[in-house]
């Protein structure tokens, strides 16, 4: 579009690609357009490369999120309802922000059964770099939101966060007819039929000597506070 040429009239040669394809999917567009305009104007091949300082200033990074939540829970730490609001700093262009923000929403439950949940996502256009794909692609941001809520509940009730996590874990179900254990479902309606979060957590607590180490830490803190 920048050159007024048809797609089949443009030839692009790339020496090597390497990895991290998500971040390269659209972040090179600005350079590509500049090269195309220069090549058409001079009728010569054109090659451009950012130096490292310009690269860091211009190219997008991981999407930073602000996640607000309101959560209701009982005295055991069981989540009765939760409402998330995601505020996503996308930058000056859309890039891959929509699927990144979507995936954060889809990971908002992490390993927990949220029976009554609302998730709202606000994708913010800002005067900063256009953020892009990064390892996890929005998943870690969504997970951090619910984990922060779990820690908040545990602190409020003076419970071990492990207890709050365990009581809220998905339990395994089955899709077989006649089985009384109906699968729980994710906020987007997917049946959970193979969750082993409780079992693996119990194994880890035993093999890590969690309780004895926790008591030792409490005793040390008491004696040295």
List the predicted regions and their residue ranges.
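Structural alpha/beta core scaffold segments of enzyme domains
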Residues: 1-225
């Amino acid at each position: 579009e920048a050159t007024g040429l048809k797609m089949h009239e443009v030839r692009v040669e790339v020496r090597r690609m390497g990895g991290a394809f998500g971040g390269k999917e659209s972040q090179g567009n600005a350079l590509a357009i500049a090269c195309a305009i220069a090549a058409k104007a001079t009728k010569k091949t054109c090659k451009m490369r950012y130096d490292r300082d310009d690269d860091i200033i211009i190219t997008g990074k991981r999407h930073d999120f602000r996640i607000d939540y309101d959560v209701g829970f009982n005295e055991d730490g069981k989540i009765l309802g939760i409402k998330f609001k995601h505020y996503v700093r996308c930058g000056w262009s859309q890039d891959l922000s929509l699927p990144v923000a979507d995936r954060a929403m889809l990971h908002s439950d992490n390993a927990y059964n949220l029976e009554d949940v609302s998730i709202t996502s606000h994708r913010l256009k800002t005067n900063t770099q256009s953020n892009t794909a990064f390892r996890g692609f929005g998943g870690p941001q969504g997970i951090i939101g619910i984990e922060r809520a779990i820690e908040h509940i545990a602190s409020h009730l003076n419970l071990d966060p492990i207890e709050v996590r365990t009581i809220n874990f998905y339990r395994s179900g089955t899709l077989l007819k006649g089985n009384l254990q109906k699968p729980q479902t994710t906020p987007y309606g997917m049946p959970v039929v193979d969750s082993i979060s409780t079992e693996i957590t119990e194994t880890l607590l035993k093999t890590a000597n969690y309780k004895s180490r926790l008591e030792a830490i409490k005793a040390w803190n008491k004696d040295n506070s």
